[in-house]
């Protein structure tokens, strides 16, 4: 694994932490349009941040030296999982946003918010696995 790839993984992990903290700090209220709209805006900001992190992740896959990293199966598998988690987060947000805007806030959407948070935490775990396996 190249030092550049490892440094990029470290940066992605560090940049993901405040996003997770922000999402975990958001209050879910199924009875308030204002609070639901605010929550959706905060999540939309997180989606944009995740897209930026995903672009950084993709740069590892696009790097010509990535072929050297393919020898490290655990590294590649964990990167794939992070990519999947980021994608699942973004896609699920789009679904949730359209449901809330069409139907209004509902109490059963709380599981959707929990799912979003869980995807980012799972991505962070895979990034941490890469970093602990290497160091």
Where does each model-flagged region fall?
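Long, low-complexity or tandemly repetitive, helically biased scaffold regions used
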Residues: 4-135
